[in-house]
Design a protein with these regions (language model features):
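Acidic, aromatic-lined catalytic clefts of primarily extracellular/periplasmic carbohydrate-active enzymes
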Residues: 1
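Short, cationic Gly/His-enriched loop motifs
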Residues: 4, 17-21, 28-105, 109-110
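GIY-YIG-like beta-to-alpha core
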Residues: 5-17, 120-124
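Exposed alpha-helical structural elements
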Residues: 9-13, 45, 150
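Structured segments of extracytoplasmic/periplasmic soluble domains
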Residues: 20, 49, 134-137, 141
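A short, exposed loop/beta-hairpin motif centered on an aromatic-Gly-Thr core
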Residues: 34-37, 114-125
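Extended, polar beta-sheet/loop recognition surfaces of beta-rich domains
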Residues: 84, 91-92, 100, 136-160
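An aromatic-rich alpha-helical recognition segment common to small helix-rich domains
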Residues: 99, 108, 121-135
Length: 160
């Protein structure tokens, strides 16, 4: 009989950071360019930060303050609800979550028992702004005010 050892959560997260930094070939395009600060090059350095900042069931993101950031460090990383991290990602079709294109128009929709339309418009940023500002309030109180306000400002300005 094989015995499995459960890996501590901090170690699994630290390992995933390193998999992004040194991706296998199948993930190389997705994770190309990630870097890690010197402090986190050893698991013990990451664990010290993790112990102070971890939020159970949240995921570690380094691109909350800057959507193009690919550097993991204490000043760039933040634990956020997985739904918030997904909200700020582009889905496979190249559009942000909640935005889709039909003909020349962009649509912002959400699902609540059935599909609800927020806006139909001619440009993707406006559709994303409508969707982002609709979904973001569910995270107020689940993350600190500073990152929440920063994300809200980015969505309002069309940066996200």
């Amino acid at each position: 009989m094989y015995q499995t050892t459960k890996i501590p959560r901090y170690r699994a997260i630290w390992n995933s950071i390193w998999m992004k930094k040194n991706p296998v070939t199948s993930n190389a395009d997705t994770f190309h360019g990630f870097t890690v600060c010197d402090e986190w090059k050893e698991a013990d350095g990451f664990k010290a930060w993790y112990d102070l900042n971890n939020v159970d069931d949240y995921e570690l993101a380094c691109d909350i303050y800057d959507k193009d950031n690919k550097h993991y460090s204490p000043s760039t990383a933040l634990f956020v609800p997985p739904q918030l991290a997904n909200l700020l990602r582009t889905r496979g079709a190249g559009f942000p979550i909640g935005v889709w294109k039909h003909g020349d128009d962009y649509h912002a929709t959400y699902w609540f028992g059935q599909r609800h339309s927020l806006v139909d418009c001619t440009d993707e940023p406006r559709a994303w702004k409508a969707y982002g500002l609709h979904k973001l309030p569910q995270f107020r109180g689940k993350i600190a005010d500073e990152p929440y306000n920063h994300i809200e400002n980015q969505i309002t300005l069309g940066i996200r």
